[in-house]
Amino acid sequence: MPPSVKQRVDRQFRQFAHTMPLTSVRHTTKSWAVEVAVSRLTTFVISLAVVVGVFSEHPAPVRLYDILSHGSVLNRVAVVGDSYTTGTDEGGLGPEAWTARAWLTLDHQGMYIAPDVSSEGRAGYGVRGDHGSVFANLTARAVRPDDALVVFFGSRNDQGVDPALLAEMARETFDLARRTAPSARILVIGPPWPAADVPETVLRVRDVVSAAARAAGATFVDPIADRWFVGRPDLIGADGVHPNDAGHAYIADKIAPIIGAQLSWRP
C-alpha cells in the first residue's frame, strides 16, 4: 500500500477510534449505544474500503466481522436441528426463529456471533428429514474448524429408530463435530415435548441422546426434565406440535443464556 494511502487509512481509523471506541460498546448494555457504534463502525468500514479500492489495483474485501474482532471476540457457532429450528407455518420463520432471536440477545450483551444454522424438518440423528438428511449430514454442512460451539437440538423424530442404532448414529455425529472443530465445545439439547405426558418412545430418545452426549464430553440440556413447555399451550401452534412465534421467543430465552455460558468458558 503506498504511504499516502496508509496515512489516509491511519487518519480515518484514529478519527473513528476517537469518536466511538469499541470498548465503550462492549461495556454498555444500552441498545442505542450499540446501534450508534455499529452505524459509525459501518461508516468507517465503507470509507476504508473506498480508500483502498481507489488506490489498489486488486482491492481486498473488508468484512465487518474482521473489524469487530479486532477489539472483541467473534464467536462462530454451528447449530444443527429439526423443524423446531427451521421454523414452520406455525411460527419461527426468518427473524422470528429462536436462533435469530438468540443471536440478537447475545449481541445486545456484547457477545458477537457468526452463526451457521443447518436444520431440516423431520430430521433426527437416525431418521432422514424432508430433504434426505440426518443430523450427521447437517453437521458436515454447518460445522467449521474454527467454531467455538456446536449446538444440537432434538429430536422427537427419532422415536421410531432402534435405540442401538440411534446411539451409534448420535455418537458418530458428535465424533464428526469433534473432528471437524477440535477446540469447539459441544452443547446437546434433547427433544422437547409440548405437554407433561411424555411418550415412552420420546423418553427413550432423550436417554439415548443424553448418554451419547455425555460420552462425547458434551453438555446436555433436558427440556423434558426442565418442563419447558408444561402448562404453556399458548407457546404451541394449532398443530399441537410446533412452537409459534411466542414459543420461539421462549426457546430463545431458554437457550441464549446457555450458549452464552458455554462461550464464556472458552480458554
Regions found by a protein language model. Name each.
Residues 153-157, 176-207:
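Active-site segments of SGNH/GDSL-like serine hydrolases
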Residues 53-119, 140-142:
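Serine-esterase "nucleophile elbow" of acetyl-processing enzymes
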Residues 76-81, 85, 114-119, 148-154, ...:
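Structural recognition of the beta-strand scaffold that forms the well-ordered cores
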Residues 194-267:
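Catalytic His-Asp segment of secreted/periplasmic serine-dependent ester chemistry enzymes
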Residues 83-86, 119-127, 156-161, 192-196, ...:
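Solvent-exposed loop/turn segments at secondary-structure junctions
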Residues 26-45:
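N-terminal Sec-pathway targeting helices
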Residues 120, 131-167:
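Oxyanion-hole/transition-state-stabilizing segment in secreted/luminal serine hydrolases
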Residues 39-57:
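Hydrophobic membrane-insertion alpha-helices, especially the h-region
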